[in-house]
Regions:
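Feature of Fe-S/electron-transfer and energy-metabolism proteins
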Residues: 1-235
Protein backbone atom coordinates (compact mmCIF):
# COMPACT_ATOMS: atom_id res chain seq x y z
CA UNK A 1 0.00 0.00 0.00
CA UNK A 2 2.83 2.39 0.84
CA UNK A 3 4.48 1.71 -2.53
CA UNK A 4 1.28 2.21 -4.52
CA UNK A 5 0.54 5.40 -2.61
CA UNK A 6 4.03 6.79 -3.19
CA UNK A 7 3.90 5.97 -6.90
CA UNK A 8 0.58 7.79 -7.26
CA UNK A 9 1.91 10.71 -5.23
CA UNK A 10 4.78 11.11 -7.69
CA UNK A 11 2.56 10.91 -10.76
CA UNK A 12 3.84 7.50 -11.89
CA UNK A 13 0.58 5.59 -11.76
CA UNK A 14 0.41 5.24 -15.56
CA UNK A 15 4.12 4.49 -15.90
CA UNK A 16 4.83 1.93 -13.17
CA UNK A 17 2.94 -1.28 -12.49
CA UNK A 18 3.09 -2.89 -9.05
CA UNK A 19 2.63 -6.67 -9.11
CA UNK A 20 2.36 -8.69 -5.91
CA UNK A 21 3.80 -12.19 -5.98
CA UNK A 22 4.47 -15.14 -3.73
CA UNK A 23 7.80 -15.72 -2.02
CA UNK A 24 10.73 -15.56 -4.44
CA UNK A 25 12.81 -17.93 -2.34
CA UNK A 26 15.11 -15.73 -0.28
CA UNK A 27 12.58 -15.53 2.52
CA UNK A 28 15.10 -14.36 5.13
CA UNK A 29 15.72 -11.20 3.09
CA UNK A 30 12.07 -10.17 2.84
CA UNK A 31 10.25 -7.97 2.23
CA UNK A 32 11.80 -7.83 -1.23
CA UNK A 33 11.18 -5.71 -4.30
CA UNK A 34 12.43 -6.38 -7.83
CA UNK A 35 12.46 -3.50 -10.30
CA UNK A 36 12.26 -4.45 -13.97
CA UNK A 37 13.43 -4.41 -16.71
CA UNK A 38 16.94 -4.40 -15.23
CA UNK A 39 15.95 -6.70 -12.35
CA UNK A 40 17.33 -4.66 -9.45
CA UNK A 41 16.76 -6.72 -6.30
CA UNK A 42 15.98 -4.73 -3.16
CA UNK A 43 15.94 -6.70 0.09
CA UNK A 44 14.68 -6.12 3.62
CA UNK A 45 12.69 -3.11 2.42
CA UNK A 46 10.92 -1.11 5.12
CA UNK A 47 7.98 1.25 4.70
CA UNK A 48 10.25 4.20 5.40
CA UNK A 49 12.50 3.14 2.48
CA UNK A 50 9.71 3.44 -0.10
CA UNK A 51 9.92 7.23 -0.75
CA UNK A 52 13.66 6.96 -1.40
CA UNK A 53 13.27 4.05 -3.83
CA UNK A 54 10.51 5.81 -5.74
CA UNK A 55 12.31 9.15 -5.92
CA UNK A 56 15.83 7.89 -6.60
CA UNK A 57 15.21 4.80 -8.71
CA UNK A 58 11.85 5.22 -10.40
CA UNK A 59 12.06 8.98 -10.95
CA UNK A 60 15.80 9.66 -11.30
CA UNK A 61 17.04 6.26 -12.47
CA UNK A 62 19.59 5.91 -9.67
CA UNK A 63 19.79 2.63 -7.80
CA UNK A 64 19.54 2.86 -4.01
CA UNK A 65 22.72 0.91 -3.34
CA UNK A 66 22.27 0.51 0.41
CA UNK A 67 19.07 -1.52 -0.13
CA UNK A 68 20.27 -3.69 -3.02
CA UNK A 69 21.08 -7.36 -2.37
CA UNK A 70 24.84 -6.94 -2.29
CA UNK A 71 25.75 -10.11 -4.17
CA UNK A 72 24.05 -8.69 -7.27
CA UNK A 73 26.23 -5.55 -7.27
CA UNK A 74 29.32 -5.74 -9.50
CA UNK A 75 31.82 -3.28 -10.94
CA UNK A 76 29.94 -3.52 -14.22
CA UNK A 77 26.50 -2.87 -12.76
CA UNK A 78 23.79 -5.22 -11.53
CA UNK A 79 24.05 -8.92 -12.33
CA UNK A 80 21.08 -11.23 -12.71
CA UNK A 81 19.64 -12.68 -9.54
CA UNK A 82 19.80 -16.06 -11.27
CA UNK A 83 23.60 -15.81 -11.24
CA UNK A 84 23.84 -15.50 -7.45
CA UNK A 85 25.00 -18.38 -5.27
CA UNK A 86 21.50 -19.06 -3.93
CA UNK A 87 19.85 -19.41 -7.33
CA UNK A 88 22.43 -20.42 -9.93
CA UNK A 89 22.27 -24.16 -9.20
CA UNK A 90 18.50 -24.27 -8.89
CA UNK A 91 16.15 -25.71 -11.48
CA UNK A 92 12.67 -24.82 -10.39
CA UNK A 93 9.78 -27.07 -11.32
CA UNK A 94 6.89 -26.84 -8.86
CA UNK A 95 8.04 -23.37 -7.76
CA UNK A 96 8.86 -22.03 -11.23
CA UNK A 97 6.17 -19.33 -11.11
CA UNK A 98 6.54 -18.36 -7.45
CA UNK A 99 7.82 -14.83 -7.13
CA UNK A 100 7.31 -14.31 -10.86
CA UNK A 101 3.55 -14.09 -11.45
CA UNK A 102 0.70 -12.48 -9.57
CA UNK A 103 -0.95 -15.50 -7.89
CA UNK A 104 -4.30 -13.71 -7.90
CA UNK A 105 -4.34 -13.29 -11.69
CA UNK A 106 -5.27 -16.35 -13.74
CA UNK A 107 -4.22 -14.62 -16.97
CA UNK A 108 -0.62 -14.41 -15.75
CA UNK A 109 -0.68 -18.14 -14.96
CA UNK A 110 -2.06 -18.89 -18.43
CA UNK A 111 0.58 -16.58 -19.91
CA UNK A 112 3.28 -18.81 -18.41
CA UNK A 113 1.77 -21.92 -19.97
CA UNK A 114 -0.74 -22.63 -17.23
CA UNK A 115 -3.62 -25.01 -17.95
CA UNK A 116 -2.02 -26.13 -21.22
CA UNK A 117 -1.21 -29.52 -19.70
CA UNK A 118 -4.84 -29.93 -18.65
CA UNK A 119 -6.03 -28.95 -22.13
CA UNK A 120 -3.73 -31.54 -23.70
CA UNK A 121 -4.87 -34.23 -21.26
CA UNK A 122 -8.56 -33.59 -21.93
CA UNK A 123 -8.26 -33.39 -25.72
CA UNK A 124 -5.46 -35.76 -26.65
CA UNK A 125 -5.05 -38.39 -23.94
CA UNK A 126 -7.03 -41.16 -22.29
CA UNK A 127 -6.90 -41.63 -18.51
CA UNK A 128 -4.64 -44.64 -19.04
CA UNK A 129 -2.33 -42.51 -21.20
CA UNK A 130 -2.04 -39.97 -18.40
CA UNK A 131 -1.27 -42.61 -15.80
CA UNK A 132 1.35 -44.21 -18.02
CA UNK A 133 2.98 -40.82 -18.60
CA UNK A 134 3.23 -40.27 -14.85
CA UNK A 135 4.62 -43.77 -14.37
CA UNK A 136 7.22 -43.21 -17.10
CA UNK A 137 8.24 -39.88 -15.55
CA UNK A 138 9.31 -41.57 -12.32
CA UNK A 139 7.43 -38.97 -10.28
CA UNK A 140 7.21 -39.95 -6.62
CA UNK A 141 5.55 -38.62 -3.49
CA UNK A 142 7.41 -36.12 -1.34
CA UNK A 143 6.81 -38.18 1.79
CA UNK A 144 9.34 -40.51 3.36
CA UNK A 145 8.05 -43.54 1.45
CA UNK A 146 8.64 -42.02 -1.98
CA UNK A 147 5.82 -44.15 -3.42
CA UNK A 148 5.44 -43.82 -7.23
CA UNK A 149 2.69 -41.32 -8.02
CA UNK A 150 1.69 -43.15 -11.19
CA UNK A 151 1.12 -46.33 -9.21
CA UNK A 152 -1.12 -44.45 -6.76
CA UNK A 153 -3.19 -43.13 -9.63
CA UNK A 154 -3.37 -46.53 -11.29
CA UNK A 155 -4.60 -48.16 -8.09
CA UNK A 156 -7.12 -45.37 -7.49
CA UNK A 157 -8.50 -45.80 -10.99
CA UNK A 158 -8.64 -49.59 -11.15
CA UNK A 159 -9.47 -50.88 -7.67
CA UNK A 160 -13.02 -49.51 -7.58
CA UNK A 161 -13.88 -48.78 -11.19
CA UNK A 162 -17.63 -48.55 -10.68
CA UNK A 163 -17.58 -46.27 -7.60
CA UNK A 164 -20.43 -43.77 -7.50
CA UNK A 165 -18.06 -41.00 -6.52
CA UNK A 166 -14.29 -40.60 -6.33
CA UNK A 167 -12.39 -37.69 -4.84
CA UNK A 168 -8.98 -36.10 -5.24
CA UNK A 169 -7.66 -35.08 -1.81
CA UNK A 170 -4.85 -32.53 -1.76
CA UNK A 171 -2.94 -32.59 1.51
CA UNK A 172 -1.53 -29.08 1.76
CA UNK A 173 -0.69 -29.40 5.45
CA UNK A 174 2.91 -29.12 6.62
CA UNK A 175 3.63 -32.07 8.86
CA UNK A 176 7.25 -31.15 9.58
CA UNK A 177 7.98 -28.28 12.01
CA UNK A 178 9.18 -25.19 10.16
CA UNK A 179 8.37 -26.59 6.73
CA UNK A 180 6.74 -24.23 4.24
CA UNK A 181 6.87 -26.06 0.88
CA UNK A 182 3.12 -26.38 0.46
CA UNK A 183 2.53 -22.89 1.76
CA UNK A 184 4.97 -21.46 -0.81
CA UNK A 185 3.13 -23.10 -3.69
CA UNK A 186 -0.33 -22.14 -2.45
CA UNK A 187 0.64 -18.53 -1.83
CA UNK A 188 2.74 -18.12 -4.96
CA UNK A 189 1.03 -20.27 -7.61
CA UNK A 190 -2.35 -21.67 -6.50
CA UNK A 191 -3.56 -22.40 -10.03
CA UNK A 192 -0.83 -25.01 -10.51
CA UNK A 193 -2.38 -26.97 -7.63
CA UNK A 194 -5.85 -26.76 -9.17
CA UNK A 195 -4.56 -27.83 -12.58
CA UNK A 196 -2.73 -30.81 -11.08
CA UNK A 197 -5.83 -31.87 -9.16
CA UNK A 198 -7.94 -31.66 -12.32
CA UNK A 199 -5.46 -33.84 -14.21
CA UNK A 200 -5.38 -36.35 -11.37
CA UNK A 201 -9.17 -36.36 -11.25
CA UNK A 202 -9.41 -37.10 -14.96
CA UNK A 203 -6.86 -39.90 -14.65
CA UNK A 204 -8.52 -41.72 -11.74
CA UNK A 205 -12.16 -40.93 -12.56
CA UNK A 206 -12.80 -38.40 -9.78
CA UNK A 207 -15.11 -35.43 -10.28
CA UNK A 208 -14.74 -33.74 -6.90
CA UNK A 209 -11.78 -32.66 -4.82
CA UNK A 210 -10.82 -31.38 -1.40
CA UNK A 211 -7.85 -29.27 -0.36
CA UNK A 212 -6.69 -29.54 3.25
CA UNK A 213 -4.89 -26.35 4.26
CA UNK A 214 -4.14 -24.89 7.68
CA UNK A 215 -6.15 -21.97 9.00
CA UNK A 216 -2.77 -20.55 10.12
CA UNK A 217 -2.07 -19.83 6.44
CA UNK A 218 -4.67 -17.10 5.76
CA UNK A 219 -2.92 -15.80 2.64
CA UNK A 220 -2.83 -19.31 1.16
CA UNK A 221 -6.52 -19.78 1.91
CA UNK A 222 -7.42 -16.40 0.42
CA UNK A 223 -5.46 -16.98 -2.78
CA UNK A 224 -6.83 -20.48 -3.17
CA UNK A 225 -10.36 -19.13 -2.93
CA UNK A 226 -9.58 -16.48 -5.55
CA UNK A 227 -7.99 -19.08 -7.84
CA UNK A 228 -10.96 -21.45 -7.53
CA UNK A 229 -13.37 -18.61 -8.35
CA UNK A 230 -11.32 -17.57 -11.38
CA UNK A 231 -10.96 -21.13 -12.66
CA UNK A 232 -14.72 -21.63 -12.44
CA UNK A 233 -15.34 -18.39 -14.33
CA UNK A 234 -12.97 -19.53 -17.09
CA UNK A 235 -14.73 -22.88 -17.28
Amino acid sequence: KALVSEIEKNGLKEEVQVVKTGCFGLCALGPIMIVYPEGTFYSMVKVEDIPEIVEEHLLKGRIVTRLVYQETVTDNGIKSLQDTAFYKKQHRVALRNCGVINPENIDEYIGEGGYQALAKVLTEMTPDDVIQTILDSGLRGRGGGGFPTGMKWKLARNIVKDADQKYVCCNADEGDPGAFMDRSVLEGDPHVVLEAMAIAGYAIGATQGYIYVRAEYPIAVERLEIAIKQAREYG
